[in-house]
Amino acid sequence: MRDFQRLTQALADILVGSPVPQAREVRLVLAAARVLHGERSDTVALDFKLQRRGLQALADRIRAEDLGGLVPYADQITPEMLAKRRQGIAQMLLGALAERRFEGLINDVTGGGVLRIEDHRPSRTDTDYRLLNGNGNPICRFNVKFHGSLFREARRHVGLPPEDCFPLATYKINQALRRQEQEKLPYVFLVLSVPDLSATDVGRPIPDDYVWALAVLRGRMVVEEAIVARLLRDDHLPLFRPLFNRMPEGQFRVISAKKADRLLREMLFERVHALSLKGFTRKFRNAEVDMHFSLTQELTPARTFLELLVQESPQRFAVRLYIGDY
């Protein structure tokens, strides 16, 4: 049962000190491991809220077939699948590191009093944070974007230097504006730009067993989130600290959904490269149709944004966000 033991050991390390996720696949692995170690199936089934008969049958299959008794496709995992899972973990880890930097910036600018942020990441929606005033009333919502990979041909195709070019999917701009209109709360994209820091760079130190376990469990979001949380703990964090140190607050910039939409309409054919390519969707099947913005000219530094907010009345500032001044 070498492969099944590898999976249980990886999960045990990922989940050390954390509650067991509610994902059924994870509970089945951990429960079967306990039965295979000699515990009574009825007791274990009760602990994991599983059917005793089904759990015992699963343990018997694993004993006979190793990991194939749990996931018949386990021997079909390819290097391409592993690379995809590693990339997904890395992208989520980059987002988590960016959010930590932003929390520090907010506290630095406001002293933790005039403004505060409300964490909405656990809700898994398009809102990462809401910015609240001193009375707890929302001023705007933030959607955090990490930008590292450069568009090398940006100058030729959209008229911007590669290091100053930020792509944002056009459908995300549309969704953000619709959300703003529905809830009457300004929607703001918070962008952390670190040129030439890509998910590939971040993915290299991720333990192979973590990546493999995620692939075996079909990329379950709760497992991916647990891996990221584990990598941010003290024993793993030193591996990623050099990357974390490349995220100075000066690289944080913001753009409201309204301003992004206005610029999209004004420069549709100049900045949406996909519209100038015949058969774009056929040539780049999984590519998004992006609008490209100038980081330095069209986005506002986050520190400037927060300082202006502290100086102005929150109500007036919210109106300016709503109409696209920033």
Model-derived segments and spans:
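Non-catalytic C-terminal interaction segments of nucleic acid-processing enzymes
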Residues: 3, 11-22, 27, 45-54, ...
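Short N-terminal edge-element motif at the start of the domain
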Residues: 81-128, 133
